[in-house]
């Protein structure tokens, strides 16, 4: 690595530590020529995730778009923005773990719903109504029934 002060191409690493939540490493360096100390950050370059929409068009994965949808679904609910950012981070982490570069939008929606169900059931129903585009009240009731079953299963697991 070149020294930013004297442009010498030799530095030694004095300290190296991970940076939380950013997947990067902070390194404290010292120039072997002039002794100048500086900090660098090293991070893995992520390949972009491509979301394939229902109509076949492709868009790059956008955390902000998911977060905006979650904020709308959680209006007037006791849910912090930090909780919603955690949902988005978990969804993105799961998507990246699949090692696929193109992911159907339906898969993204299912992941968001699964994460949201554990945060707030009302927000889950609101998000599901937009994501699943309920055509009539029967589909809405079916979704509510599935959510109630999942809730009861979770309660039973917590009691054992």
Swiss-Prot record:
Gene Ontology terms for molecular function: ATP binding; DNA binding; zinc ion binding
ATP-cone domain boundaries: 49-139
Alphabetical UniProt keywords? ATP-binding, DNA-binding, Metal-binding, Nucleotide-binding, Repressor, Transcription, Transcription regulation, Zinc, Zinc-finger
Q: Which cofactor does it need?
A: Zn(2+)
Any one Gene Ontology biological process term? negative regulation of DNA-templated transcription
A single Pfam family it belongs to is Zn_ribbon_NrdR
Q: What remark does the entry make about the cofactor?
A: Binds 1 zinc ion.
Does Zinc count among this protein's keywords?
yes
Give the superkingdom in one word.
Answer: Bacteria
The entry's function note states:
Negatively regulates transcription of bacterial ribonucleotide reductase nrd genes and operons by binding to NrdR-boxes.
Q: Which family does it belong to?
A: Belongs to the NrdR family.
**UniProt-recorded name of the protein:** Transcriptional repressor NrdR
Q: Which organism is it from?
A: Exiguobacterium sibiricum (strain DSM 17290 / CCUG 55495 / CIP 109462 / JCM 13490 / 255-15)
